[in-house]
């Protein structure tokens, strides 16, 4: 836009007694809404801005009356006139261009784009008005009218006076010093500053030498490692063929194993069938053997019972015979005792007679009678010993027979039970 034409339109608006809408100034507000570029000072277009704002609020109220429903309980209800006066009071108190000038111009030029109700529109205007930061017009900083700005961002135009950046955050923001850009790949000194050209050339030569040495060492390392890791492609092909052959062998071995497993499973099944048959036959044999054993045991039991009965009968018959034998043995014992007593008496009488004969003869007799008497004594002693041994044997036999009878007698009631 032409700044001179804009300034003339603003002067005409102030001179008029009856304020009306000016198309040139409306075009200026549309330009600010699109680009955010304010080419003139705030004091120059402040009056028309307030006039346009008041007119838009009044038109919005007439076209969109207040809603019929109750107000929102979460929001404080403020009447239209009070909200209008508050907004106008804030705007008249500005001494500079608010940094939300672009959004305010959008609301003034197209109010129904985002709002349909009066209350919401007024709250949107109030939110954009209650700010503190200010911006300067682009003409004051750059003295040119060929700058492009969109939403607060500067874009270079055809003017050569455009710098790299423009201060859009207000007058208080300091500008940084223009320092040469340093690439990260360039060598740096210990102080963080770029080195001189001579040192750069020397460093470049050193870097080239290092690169050559590194490349040579890397090639040597690769050549040393290559026989271990990276082999010749022909060898790789041979290895691949070897792997394929091994895979085929493994596949064949797997097939052979499968067939072997199948055959073994069939053999196992046949063996199991044979075992079942053998077990069945062995069971039959066991049954037959059990039957024969049962018959044998029954016959043995019958024979044992018959033998017991016979032994029982014989024992009963033997009891009186044994009693008679015992009686006879007792009689024999008594007879033997009587004979032994008689023999003793005879021996005593013989001894007394021999003594008498010795006394009467007084040693005049020969040794013959003495020897005869001694022989007689020996014979009598032998007879007595034989009789005593016989009697001992008889007693031992009788005691053994008595013990056998007692055991047989004790066994008989057990067998009867």
Curated annotation (Swiss-Prot):
Tissue specificity: Widely expressed.
The keyword Chaperone is annotated on this UniProt entry: no
Sequence segments annotated as region (Disordered): 140-417
One GO biological process term: protein modification process
Protein origin, superkingdom: Eukaryota
GO molecular function terms listed in the Swiss-Prot or TrEMBL record: protein phosphatase regulator activity; protein-macromolecule adaptor activity
Bias kind Acidic residues: ranges: 298-311, 338-350, 400-417
Subcellular location: Cytoplasm, Cytoskeleton, Microtubule organizing center, Centrosome; Nucleus
Low complexity bias: start-end ranges: 214-226, 366-375
Pfam annotation, one family: PPP4R2
GO cellular component: centrosome; chromatin; cytoplasm; nucleoplasm; nucleus; protein phosphatase 4 complex
Biased composition (Polar residues): 140-149, 158-170, 186-196, 259-269, 385-399
Keywords assigned by UniProt, alphabetized: Cytoplasm, Cytoskeleton, mRNA processing, mRNA splicing, Nucleus, Phosphoprotein
InterPro entries from the UniProt entry: PPP4R2 (IPR015267)
Biased composition (Basic and acidic residues): 197-213, 231-258, 283-297, 318-327, 353-363
Residues modified as Phosphoserine: 159, 226
Annotated family: Belongs to the PPP4R2 family.
Function statement: Regulatory subunit of serine/threonine-protein phosphatase 4 (PP4). May regulate the activity of PPP4C at centrosomal microtubule organizing centers. Its interaction with the SMN complex leads to enhance the temporal localization of snRNPs, suggesting a role of PPP4C in maturation of spliceosomal snRNPs. The PPP4C-PPP4R2-PPP4R3A PP4 complex specifically dephosphorylates H2AX phosphorylated on 'Ser-140' (gamma-H2AX) generated during DNA replication and required for DNA double strand break repair. Mediates RPA2 dephosphorylation by recruiting PPP4C to RPA2 in a DNA damage-dependent manner.
Subunit-structure text: Serine/threonine-protein phosphatase 4 (PP4) occurs in different assemblies of the catalytic and one or more regulatory subunits. Component of the PP4 complexes PPP4C-PPP4R2, PPP4C-PPP4R2-PPP4R3A and PPP4C-PPP4R2-PPP4R3B. The PPP4C-PPP4R2 complex appears to be a tetramer composed of 2 molecules of PPP4C and 2 molecules of PPP4R2. Interacts with DDX20/GEMIN3 and GEMIN4. Interacts with RPA2; this DNA damage-dependent interaction recruits PPP4C leading to RPA2 dephosphorylation.
Protein's UniProt name: Serine/threonine-protein phosphatase 4 regulatory subunit 2
Organism: Homo sapiens
